[in-house]
Swiss-Prot record:
InterPro entries: ATP_synth_asu-like_sf, ATP_synth_asu_C, ATP_synth_asu_C_sf, ATP_synth_F1_a_nt-bd_dom, ATP_synth_F1_asu, ATPase_a/bsu_AS, ATPase_F1/V1/A1_a/bsu_N, ATPase_F1/V1/A1_a/bsu_N_sf. Produces ATP from ADP in the presence of a proton gradient across the membrane. The alpha chain is a regulatory subunit. GO terms for cellular component: plasma membrane; proton-transporting ATP synthase complex. The record marks 373 as: Required for activity. The gene is atpA. It comes from the Bacteria. Residues 540-549 have a biased composition (Basic residues). This is ATP synthase subunit alpha. It comes from Mycobacterium ulcerans (strain Agy99). PANTHER family: ATP SYNTHASE SUBUNIT ALPHA, MITOCHONDRIAL. Its EC number is 7.1.2.2. It catalyses: ATP + H2O + 4 H(+)(in) = ADP + phosphate + 5 H(+)(out). Belongs to the ATPase alpha/beta chains family.
Amino acid sequence: MAELTISANDIQSAIEEYVGSFTSDTSREEVGTVVDAGDGIAHVEGLPSVMTQELLEFPGGVLGVALNLDEHSVGAVILGNSENIEEGQQVKRTGEVLSVPVGDAFLGRVINPLGQPIDGRGDIKAETRRALELQAPSVVQRQSVKEPLQTGIKAIDAMTPIGRGQRQLIIGDRKTGKTAVCVDTILNQRQNWETGDPKKQVRCVYVAVGQKGTTIASVRRALEEGGAMDYTTIVAAPASDSAGFKWLAPYTGSAVAQHWMYDGKHVLIVFDDLTKQAEAYRAISLLLRRPPGREAYPGDVFYLHSRLLERCAKLSDELGGGSLTGLPIIETKANDISAYIPTNVISITDGQCFLETDLFNQGVRPAINVGVSVSRVGGAAQIKAIKEVAGSLRLDLSQYRELEAFAAFASDLDATSKAQLDRGARLVELLKQPQYQPMPVEEQVISIFLGTGGHLDSVPVEDVRRFETELLDHIRASEENLLSTIRDTQKLTEETEEALTKVINHFKKGFASSTGESVVPDEHVEAMDEEDLGKESVKVKKPAPQKKK
């Protein structure tokens, strides 16, 4: 039988190998205990080194955010289902602040405020992650707004223009078409996207906060049918989500958009709507026992929106020249724009489009109130062609509204007032636009030129929209060079204006009104003097005097 021999060296090497490969499963981590939980809020004892807005891990993989850092406990907002969180459960620190995955893979997808896909189309491979709470670009990192962002809506592009990097508030009562205005703006970016030019392309982010699930689905369907989901990301926090998700959703959308902005690209973000975010934040703050202020909102509700909207900017050329344009939506009650949240957001943004219930019910859609709507910086970004034709549009409409109220009581109006009323009625009709049908800027120029140039004065009010539609169809079919000239030069030169007037006058000859009458204006005839009215004039032909013989 062979003798088994083990040397001391073998034993030593085996022990060294075992010790070298040994790993300890123990780790040092802070663990807290749930003291109480309910209504999407949990109070946790322990965790002395936790950071503000740090992610906490609850049992079952549920995440929370540390908001209140008290002396002996932490107030956390639970992100997700909080029904299974009970007193006495352990809570772990993650050591990470809130962040979301970002990148081009998110285009065409629907995600929740944690960046997780919820459209059933599989996982998303992100390029990198971005923190939700980031400092907005400083004054030095910005430049003035100078490039237009066309909405495709005549009333906005002509009178309250929006530039890339601007924040334009869309404000109004419920059911006045606020979402439709923003969806139209997203749809209007398709033409730029199809050019493939990075300087023209605009990526879009639609943030739905507290909306019904059916509303979000209908918006997504409208974007898909319009071919806009190719360049759009939807961040959804529907009404069924917890208050924590509704509070975070706008910051998630901003993080996704800022990634592209700092990459030198142009982005449009829609917050629909910030009123519901403020209400969710109010609920969180009251449950965390923070002292309430005006309308029971916490003292930092202004900062909630200002730090969000200040991220919209036009970056300097040194940082790539990217831009982030914001369209926040605020819902008012009974057209009261002097309430707390509306006045806050009006003071933060660079202008507002005020949508009015009365105008909407009268059939004026989009129901934009010209008198209250304003754009503080977009005028510098407006193209020259629009600026030339729309120069008098706001004044004409304002005078029309004043005269309209006066004419309701006055029976006898002078000729000038009647002419202003007639022109104003046609302009109002001209600015009406169907939903989900944005108009290219060159066609807007022609449309507004019709109204401000007086070419519609002889067209009956009920035929104005049909005249506009048929004229644009005619120009697309046989005068395409006119559209391309305006599109390329972005100006309305004298030659183009003459050619356009010639086309309009020629088209009028073949256009019949709904009553069958011609819309060609009668030739101008000089009026008789007042003293000559009612007098008969008789021409007597006198024979020529005969010469004396």
